[in-house]
Amino acid sequence: MACPALGLEALQPLQPEPPPEPAFSEAQKWIEQVTGRSFGDKDFRTGLENGILLCELLNAIKPGLVKKINRLPTPIAGLDNIILFLRGCKELGLKESQLFDPSDLQDTSNRVTVKSLDYSRKLKNVLVTIYWLGKAANSCTSYSGTTLNLKEFEGLLAQMRKDTDDIESPKRSIRDSGYIDCWDSERSDSLSPPRHGRDDSFDSLDSFGSRSRQTPSPDVVLRGSSDGRGSDSESDLPHRKLPDVKKDDMSARRTSHGEPKSAVPFNQYLPNKSNQTAYVPAPLRKKKAEREEYRKSWSTATSPLGGERPFRYGPRTPVSDDAESTSMFDMRCEEEAAVQPHSRARQEQLQLINNQLREEDDKWQDDLARWKSRRRSVSQDLIKKEEERKKMEKLLAGEDGTSERRKSIKTYREIVQEKERRERELHEAYKNARSQEEAEGILQQYIERFTISEAVLERLEMPKILERSHSTEPNLSSFLNDPNPMKYLRQQSLPPPKFTATVETTIARASVLDTSMSAGSGSPSKTVTPKAVPMLTPKPYSQPKNSQDVLKTFKVDGKVSVNGETVHREEEKERECPTVAPAHSLTKSQMFEGVARVHGSPLELKQDNGSIEINIKKPNSVPQELAATTEKTEPNSQEDKNDGGKSRKGNIELASSEPQHFTTTVTRCSPTVAFVEFPSSPQLKNDVSEEKDQKKPENEMSGKVELVLSQKVVKPKSPEPEATLTFPFLDKMPEANQLHLPNLNSQVDSPSSEKSPVMTPQFKFWAWDPEEERRRQEKWQQEQERLLQERYQKEQDKLKEEWEKAQKEVEEEERRYYEEERKIIEDTVVPFTVSSSSADQLSTSSSMTEGSGTMNKIDLGNCQDEKQDRRWKKSFQGDDSDLLLKTRESDRLEEKGSLTEGALAHSGNPVSKGVHEDHQLDTEAGAPHCGTNPQLAQDPSQNQQTSNPTHSSEDVKPKTLPLDKSINHQIESPSERRKKSPREHFQAGPFSPCSPTPPGQSPNRSISGKKLCSSCGLPLGKGAAMIIETLNLYFHIQCFRCGICKGQLGDAVSGTDVRIRNGLLNCNDCYMRSRSAGQPTTL
């Protein structure tokens, strides 16, 4: 805020005055000695700028004066420390006028022209505060350190006085409109404030500029009327916010001036018609104002050398008779030279300007506070985010005990590594097995622990025994003696092929026939026809159930005798599956077909884009016939589970006098058809009659097997996959002849049996059909759901058995409880007697119930129903259906609407069958509750209390039904609670066998709007009555008596202590007697 004071001196550059070296050096030396810390290479102002040294200086003078020092290297932290230092100085006894302004060390000014002078002046203000602090420290009892040499400051104070004299010299131009204040002698005992924040002094114009971040323009601050006389100042004052002296430390240090002051034009520095020459821009006025600032702070009254002599600045005109009262000179413009310098209007105008400045200062303080709080909240947010980031880093690094959590969250790499490790362990254990049974056990154990999925199977490595030829040892005995039982595990295909085909063919002489091989087949299967049939079919997957299933999962044997030849076939599937029974008809989805023909000796290879045809021609006149068929399994049939079925049947008849080998390498194109044709001459048909389903003519010259490879073939790693076709024709040696497709990285074991002296043709194919896979998945899912359903049913049956067992226990315990309760009742119940008149009243009024009139009798049938219903309800407690039953019971009780427990005590014979097992109210000695009104109406809160199971006597076990009853009351709606009479509440709650039926009471206990007495049942009338609205209790004053001793309770002048115990009114004496007798209470 620019000060409206301006002088000619301000128009020229101001040279900084050299600071008085003795005062600076003394102050720095004293601070270093007291705090024990050095300024180092910092100058005086820089060393004190952060306020840390000042706060430590205060703590050294008086320990604990500054409790917390902010050591952050930020300007706002330094400002906080300086404010704490100034507050501590006040506590040491320094006056506010002796303290410097926080902005004297925290420079926020952006003015360049006055920076040197401003710097020097502010440092002098700091030195003066240190001077007074040293003076206070010398007189402080808690301080015993180095004393400040006050004489070193004399030069500083003298120079400041001299500067003041120069500034206040009357040799000024008329255009120098700066203020000259005369000091009041009343201020001689105190120091003027270096903060320049006196309330009524115009010095406060400068103080705001030293504290604000930006200097507002005079247009903002000096608002006024256009007439230049401030005529709206009076109406403007009530709407201005006056500063809070306690809150605003700047305004708190302003001392008041006792006299009214003359006014100046409110907007005298704004350019207008009446005042055009007086307007000078704000920065120029500010220069002069800041030169005056330190002068105003150091008059003779504030000087330690000036004593009590007031400082005079030349001639002055007192306004009042008081010789010591002073006022400020007028700031006259040329047009206003005639205005009296000490007029009241000017002082009012100055006061108005001060108010405006205070408002601006308050606004600045509010903005600063808001900025601090926003900065603090942002800092807290940043701290929280930093903590969260560190926490996440710890989580990712596995620190801070989070490794346990990570155990359950595995990465994909960990899962794959664990799977591979398991497979390696399985391979090693399988290879090291010493017998077939041990190997089967190992595999079965693995299957039980882990699901053998496609991914697991495709990662199983091919055992070494399957990598060599089986032509020399084709018998099953060789397998039994084989040290490597891994021959049953599937090969590893990388990547897993969508389609894999392995054709293994063994061709033997037609003259050899072994009929004993048919012993291994399950049931006679369909004969094979020479027509093209599917050879590759997918199989559904399921886990084997025993060790034999394990073997059959990998291997299926099928044998058939055709035309005097025995064909033994084995098939290994790409997906593990149980054995399947042969289908009796071919399906339409015949995906892969094979046709085999033999024409002659030359080997012909035809290849085009669509197919590869391999013709192997053998010049042999021996009649031969090749027939190979495979039947496609229908996946959704029950035949999937048949272990003894044959999956495919093949027949190849070959006769040769000498073995011949034909080998060809085929590079597969995408749709590929391989033809292997074996021409045959007329052949003996002596065994044709054995064929049951032969569909081709018997004189068929050739059988064809056509293999169509779909385009879904996944190529292996080798750049050019090969198909090697090898036909060793052996005369009498049982040797396996294999047709291999090595591009699948697989070789399959030759099928044989120890019973077979000759080798028969064999074909092995694997295939994968997405449709079959989907069906297999559906079937597996259905199986899992069925197993889950069965397990759930078993659990339900088990729970039902336990529930029935608990029911029996509950009934037995209930029976014993009834017996114990009956004994207690017989010992403690006192017969209830009523007079004949009250009995008549009972009989006449007991029929008033909701919707129906009921005789006041003991309804034994209802009591039986109640008992059965309670038992039924109790039996269902174990099944978590209490709430439903309680609601049902409460509805039933409301529908009955009758009070079924009527006059149980009229006969004096307690009905044990109607006793509720949880009602312990009758266990009190002497049955005090069976007096005139044993069932004083209970509201829902009472019912909840009376149903508490803790009120049972020592020899009676509490049940769970009281809790159910309390829940029953809680779930009632408030309207239902209001509708129920206290009697009905009690009936819905625990039953008392000795409780007589009170007078008939309607739900609102009123007849035609009249309240009924809870004791005698008659309307209250107009007489005196005792009404307890919260409990729905109403009594005639004569009926308001103790239910035990029958003493009057309403006639006491000084008041009566009435207890309501178990529905009865008890006087204090009876209540204390029953309590001392150890009887339980529900209240």
Swiss-Prot record:
The superkingdom listed in its UniProt entry is Eukaryota
Subcellular location(s) per record: Cytoplasm, Cytoskeleton, Stress fiber
- Record keywords: Transcription regulation included? no
- Which GO biological process entries does UniProt record here? actomyosin structure organization; cytoplasmic actin-based contraction involved in cell motility; negative regulation of cell migration; positive regulation of protein phosphorylation; positive regulation of stress fiber assembly; regulation of focal adhesion assembly
Instruction: Output compositional bias ranges, type Low complexity.
Output: 204-213, 835-855
All copies of the Calponin-homology (CH) domain together span 21-125
Q: Where is this region: Disordered?
A: 185-326, 615-665, 677-704, 831-1008
Return the similarity comment. Answer: Belongs to the LIMCH1 family.
This one is known as LIM and calponin homology domains-containing protein 1
Which species is the source of this protein?
Homo sapiens (Human)
Q: What is the lineage of its organism?
A: Eukaryota, Metazoa, Chordata, Craniata, Vertebrata
In the UniProt record, the gene name given for this protein reads LIMCH1
